[in-house]
C-alpha cells in the first residue's frame, strides 16, 4: 500500500482514474459531496474503487456533522460538535455525543467506507476554518465530549482521526485560503490546545492524527503538517503517539508555503506523515505520484473498518431509529438557537 490518498471527480470512475488507482504509491481515496448522488450510487462507486485498485485502499470521507457532512440525503443529519455543549444535562450530552459517533460510523461502514476524518479536537470557535466544528472552548469539556464521540465510533468498528494537531482553534485565518500563523507562546499551546491530544493519546483512543497547516511561530517556521518538530519530537517522542499521521489536504493554501505539490508531499512524508492527501487538483496529484520517493505504507491497513452493517437492517434497528430521532432534533434545536442570535 502506498502513502498517497487521492480523490475522484464525479459519481463514477473514468478510465484515467482507474489507472491512477493502480499506481503503487496510491493507498487511499477520499470522497466528497460531488461524488454523492444517492446511497445506491455511492455504494456502487465504492465498489468500483475497490475493484480498480490492486490492493485494498483506505476509503475516507469528512462526515463530521454540521457544515462538514459530505453525504446528506438518505443519511442522518448530524449536529455540529458545538451543539452538544448547549445540552444542560451532562449525562444526556455525553450519550448523544456517543450516539453521534456510533451512528455516523455505522452509516459510513454500511457504504463500505473505512474512516471519517473525525473528531475535530480544536479548542474554541474563533477560527474561520473551525468554528462550530469544535466541541467546546474549554479543553476539559471538549475532552469529555470527544471521548464519548470516539467511543461511539469505536463501538461501530471505525478508527478515529483527531484533528488538527497541535490545535487550529486559536487562529482566525482559514488554512484552506492562506497559511495561518499562531504567535502564542508554546507554553499556552501546551496547556490549552494540546491537553485534549495528550489525554486521548494516553488513553489510547486516537488511531490517527491529522496535523494543522498552521505555522506556530514560537516552534518552527514550517506548518505543523510539514514539521518534524511537531510530528516527531512532540507527537511521537514526547506524547508517545504510535498511530497513523495524515497530512491535511496538500492542495490547501496553508500548505503552499512548502513548495510545489511534489515538494509538499515529500516534505510532509519526511517530517513524519504516514499518508498524504492530495485533493481537488489532478495535475498536482499526478506530479506527486511522478516525483515522490518510492515508499510503502502497509501500516495503514490498521485503518480498515472492522464493523459490518447492512444499510436496510441498520435503519430498521431500534438503536439507529432512536439515535437518528434524537440527533436530528438536536440539529434542529441548534439551528433555531443560532437563528435567534
UniProtKB/Swiss-Prot annotation:
GO terms for cellular component: cytoplasm. PROSITE patterns: GLYCOSYL_HYDROL_F3. The keyword Cell cycle applies. GO terms for biological process: carbohydrate metabolic process; cell division; cell wall organization; peptidoglycan biosynthetic process; peptidoglycan turnover; regulation of cell shape. Its EC number is 3.2.1.52. One of its GO terms (molecular function) is beta-N-acetylhexosaminidase activity. Its main location: cytoplasm. Pathway: Cell wall biogenesis; peptidoglycan recycling. It is found in: Cytoplasm. Substrate binds at residues 62, 70, 133, 163-164. The record marks 174 as: Important for catalytic activity. The active site is at 176 (proton donor/acceptor), 248 (nucleophile). It catalyses: Hydrolysis of terminal non-reducing N-acetyl-D-hexosamine residues in N-acetyl-beta-D-hexosaminides. Keywords: Cell cycle, Cell division, Cell shape, Cell wall biogenesis/degradation, Cytoplasm, Glycosidase, Hydrolase, Peptidoglycan synthesis. Belongs to the glycosyl hydrolase 3 family. NagZ subfamily. NCBIfam families: PRK05337.1. Plays a role in peptidoglycan recycling by cleaving the terminal beta-1,4-linked N-acetylglucosamine (GlcNAc) from peptide-linked peptidoglycan fragments, giving rise to free GlcNAc, anhydro-N-acetylmuramic acid and anhydro-N-acetylmuramic acid-linked peptides. This is Beta-hexosaminidase. It comes from Yersinia enterocolitica serotype O:8 / biotype 1B (strain NCTC 13174 / 8081).
Amino acid at each position: 500500500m502506498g502513502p498517497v490518498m487521492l480523490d475522484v471527480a464525479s459519481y463514477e470512475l473514468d478510465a484515467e482514474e482507474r489507472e491512477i488507482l493502480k499506481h503503487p504509491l496510491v493507498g487511499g481515496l477520499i470522497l466528497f459531496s460531488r461524488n454523492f448522488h444517492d446511497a445506491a450510487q455511492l455504494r456502487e462507486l465504492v465498489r468500483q474503487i475497490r475493484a480498480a485498485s490492486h490492493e485494498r485502499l483506505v476509503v475516507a470521507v469528512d462526515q463530521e456533522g454540521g457544515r462538514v457532512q459530505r453525504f446528506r440525503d438518505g443519511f442522518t443529519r448530524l449536529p455540529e460538535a458545538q451543539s452538544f455543549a448547549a445540552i444542560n444535562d451532562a449525562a444526556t450530552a455525553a450519550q448523544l455525543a456517543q450516539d453521534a459517533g456510533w451512528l455516523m460510523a455505522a452509516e459510513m461502514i454500511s457504504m463500505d467506507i473505512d474512516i471519517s476524518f473525525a473528531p475535530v479536537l480544536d479548542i474554541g470557535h474563533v477560527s474561520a476554518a473551525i468554528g462550530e466544528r469544535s466541541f467546546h472552548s474549554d479543553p476539559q469539556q471538549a475532552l469529555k465530549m470527544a471521548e464519548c464521540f470516539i467511543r461511539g465510533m469505536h463501538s461501530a468498528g471505525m478508527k478515529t482521526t483527531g484533528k488538527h494537531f497541535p490545535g487550529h482553534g486559536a487562529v482566525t485565518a482559514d488554512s484552506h485560503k492562506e497559511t495561518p500563523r499562531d504567535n502564542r507562546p508554546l507554553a499556552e499551546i501546551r496547556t490549552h490546545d494540546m491537553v485534549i491530544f495528550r489525554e486521548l493519546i494516553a488513553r489510547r483512543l486516537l488511531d490517527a492524527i491529522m496535523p494543522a497547516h498552521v505555522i506556530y511561530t514560537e516552534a518552527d517556521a514550517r506548518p505543523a503538517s510539514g514539521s518534524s518538530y511537531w510530528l516527531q519530537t512532540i507527537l511521537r517522542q514526547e506524547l508517545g503517539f504510535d498511530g497513523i499521521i495524515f497530512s491535511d489536504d496538500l492542495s490547501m493554501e496553508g500548505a503552499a508555503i512548502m513548495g510545489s505539490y511534489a515538494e509538499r508531499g515529500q516534505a510532509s512524508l519526511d517530517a513524519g506523515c504516514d499518508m498524504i492527501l492530495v485533493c481537488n487538483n489532478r495535475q498536482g496529484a499526478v506530479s506527486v505520484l511522478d516525483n515522490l520517493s518510492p515508499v510503502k505504507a502497509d501500516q495503514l491497513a490498521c485503518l480498515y473498518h472492522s464493523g459490518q452493517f447492512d444499510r436496510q437492517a441498520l435503519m430498521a434497528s431500534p438503536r439507529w431509529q432512536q439515535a437518528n430521532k434524537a440527533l436530528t432534533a438536536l440539529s434542529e434545536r441548534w439551528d433555531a438557537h443560532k437563528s435567534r442570535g
